Amino acid sequence: MYSLIFLALIGAAFGVPLSTNEDSTRNQNLAALYVLPQTSYPTFYDVRLFIDPGYTEAFHGNVSIRIIPNINIDQITIHAMAMRIDSIRVVSDVNPNEDLFSDFTLATDDTHLLTIRLTRNITALQPHVIHIDYVAQYADDMFGVYVSTYEENGRTVNLVTSQLQPTFARRAFPCYDEPALKAVFRTTIYAPAAYATVRSNTPERRDSLKPNEPGYVKHEFEDTLVMSTYLIAYLVSNFNYIENSQNPIYPIPFRVYSRPGTQNTAEFALEFGQQNMIALEEYTEFPYAFPKIDKAAVPDFAAGAMENWGLVIYREVALLVREGVTTTSVKQNIGRIICHENTHMWFGNEVGPMSWTYTWLNEGFANFFENYATDFVRPQWRMMDQFVIAMQNVFQSDAVLSVNPMTHPVYTPSQIIGTFNAVAYQKSGSVIRMLQHFMTPEIFRRGLVIYIKANSRAAAAPSDLYVALQQALDESSHRIPKPISTIMTEWSTQGGFPVLTVRRTAPNADSVFVAQERYLTDRSLTSTDRWHVPVNWVISSNVNFSDTSPQAWILPTFPATAVDVPGLSNADWYIFNKQQTGYYRVNYDVENWVALARVLNNSHEIIHVLNRAQIVDDAFNLARNGRLHYKNAFEISRYLEMEKDYIPWAAANPAFNYLDIVLSGANSYNLYRYYLLNLTAPMFEDLGFDVKSGEEFVTPYHRNIILDINCRFGNQRCISRAQEILQAFKNNPNQRPNPDIQTLVYCSSLRAGNVENFNFLWNMYLGTSDSSEQSILLSALGCTSNAERRNFYLNQIIDDNSAVREQDRHSIAVSVINSSPEGMNVALDFVVENFHRIQPRVQALTGTTNILNTFARRLTTSAHNEKIDELVRRHESIFSAGERASIAAIRENIAASIAWSNSNAGIVENWLKENYGPPSGAKSLTAGLLVLISLFVAIFNH
């Protein structure tokens, strides 16, 4: 399942630390309540569904489950949810005429247990079949089987589809709804003739096994391979498709389904998807197992996409590319999501997790390969360079004491959905990337080949992965200090990550001391967690960044380790963690930071681009954390005036955004704005608004960073040009802005409060059915500074007649929160007042957590904390587990921001005054001009 879910659940990565004994007892109690008893298991399901999208309340179904008792039993416990059980029969192969069913109970709590009691004991290992007739409710939150709609020629068209991961197959049919309890599935869907496109995981059968039913067309599908319940999928619609039958790149039938009239937007998915499948098959040395691949784009979908085996379902914006409308970023995201889901065909489908405790075995590998395997077929996208930026971002959520580790026991449905978070995705993917480099890429690949072949169609635990990787390592000449299982168990069962502090043992020595400790945002907290940390380095006298295998290991058993670095005595500077392949931060002695600033400002291209990004990111975050003086971070940042590569700018941008937030309202804020305008001036001239011939694929991202800083912080040329572009578009619809700068152009044109511009863009939103364009407009509309229009926009979240789909409504709040400090405060008041109305009107499970997590990144003061207190007082009784975790994250971040201001605001102000305040020489701003810029910014923003 792609990361639109986990991005909204970053807060759910946080938990309440318990003692070992408390944790163990709690887990035992939860397991007893929620985990199915290991007294029987399924081998085969025969599911019949009667689905009419025109009837939106419920559907009828029946299922026959062939089971094997492990012991003699007199009751069978499975899962069922949100359904009425009409009849149950239990029969054996030995005597199929004897019905052993006595009675049943269906739990009304979130255990969702259906307990079937029998008239007598049934014997261990004797196959039996459970027959159940039921009526199930369509899900109203897009988790389960649900009805979606779209507009076509002025009329509303219905379709039915599904999202069963992680615990919602039980809403489609009674089943053993745990990932390890795999079986073969036979599916038959009866649908009205008006719905011609009916799909499931396998192709339709050529023979007929089931009777016809009046008023329905029967669609019988071939039996699946052994698979988990959560991978079953359905689509009943009028969709059309394009396919690879005429010119196949990939030898298996490959189709892309979408709304009628959108088939031209599916061409990229068809081409890229096939190319990527070939690359993954070659890498894994294991063929895709199913006889077809369908990709379907549906208008309403809870996740970004879902890897159902043979029928992968996507949100439209995650699959369809419309030339001239889809941005470079969205197109890249579509490629990455396609690769993510393709990867799951091996990591998740072919080899699945033993339980959702090991969600990272699915999502961590999918996160890694969505970048690594996209790089195979689109190297110009620089996905593995961009991966480092994503890793730096996840450091933020992984730097709190309460964060859960990769392997984290979960039992309840809410706990399980909470595992689909930044830890399971981006952190796990980052640790896997580190694993690849410390094993070396080819040995790592060989280990994965062994893993997939050894565990095909089975349920795996991390230990199974480690055994396979160890075998590949043992068959090579490469050595590491401890077994894979020892090293990886530390990384997967401990939350957080280390910071290494490296300093020379003596001025002329050829060695360094390296100390590790857990990196925590709140330094008043402590942790004894330690790791086996692979390290490598570059010194100024021997600049080689290409070999990323370990040159040494920092062991968890020693507080500090002396590491020999030959040639260091003759080196001006040194860098640890080549290409930032290790999942950790690095701090240095002050002399080395000064030397790094010097080399960056004199000849930055000597240093690998990923290490330039690492140095910038580490420096600002270590300064934020009180481990480094801000002067050192700012001196390093000066080199960015000369930096023409996107990646270091992408690393710097979050630090600049953080300082923008915490300095807002401070005496130094206008100096800070001038510092950024000065820093970005060369790239503003170089990039401008217009695309140039031969630009890199990632240049649009770079342009957006530079233009955003300049338009937001008062560069009149930037603001005027943005307004000119929008006005030209208003005058002539054929002069549509370049999609890559549309959000920036629209947002900049709204900041002045122009009502006409807002209404123009809102009417654009109402008039488009393209999901990419809708996303751009939703992101921009929150930028308005007009109070009446902003309130109108926020109220679209709770307006039952709003044109904004529920799955997108959280974007309204996110847009307003991110627009400006004023917008954030208005949005905070709105959420405090209306949380009980927002919660049922945004996407279930993720909408409100997405909003709260956006606040977590922006709330900084004690006044904000008081508002959160009010939110809790008024609405705590309806908070979900994810919402509670997000509130905890908000409080922690506010406390950290207050502490930052107390410790660092004066330091930052002094540096800015010394370097950008009057009178400080050639680079300084005169007092009069500073006043003018301050006045203009104030007028423009208000």
UniProtKB/Swiss-Prot annotation:
Its cofactor is Zn(2+). The active site is at 341 (proton acceptor). The record marks 425 as: Transition state stabilizer. It is found in: Cell membrane. Zn(2+) binds at residues 340, 344, 363. Pfam families: ERAP1_C, Peptidase_M1, Peptidase_M1_N. It catalyses: Release of an N-terminal amino acid, Xaa-|-Yaa- from a peptide, amide or arylamide. Xaa is preferably Ala, but may be most amino acids including Pro (slow action). When a terminal hydrophobic residue is followed by a prolyl residue, the two may be released as an intact Xaa-Pro dipeptide. GO terms for molecular function: alanyl aminopeptidase activity; metalloaminopeptidase activity; peptide binding; zinc ion binding. Keywords: Aminopeptidase, Cell membrane, Disulfide bond, Glycoprotein, GPI-anchor, Hydrolase, Lipoprotein, Membrane, Metal-binding, Metalloprotease, Protease, Signal, Zinc. The keyword tRNA-binding does not apply. It is an enzyme of class 3 (hydrolase). InterPro entries: Aminopeptidase_N-like_N, Aminopeptidase_N-like_N_sf, ERAP1-like_C_dom, M1_APN-typ, Peptidase_M1, Peptidase_M1_aminopeptidases, Peptidase_M1_dom, Peptidase_M4/M1_CTD_sf. Residues 1-15 form the signal peptide. GO terms for biological process: peptide catabolic process; proteolysis. Substrate binds at residues 304-308. Belongs to the peptidase M1 family. This is Aminopeptidase N. The gene is APN2.
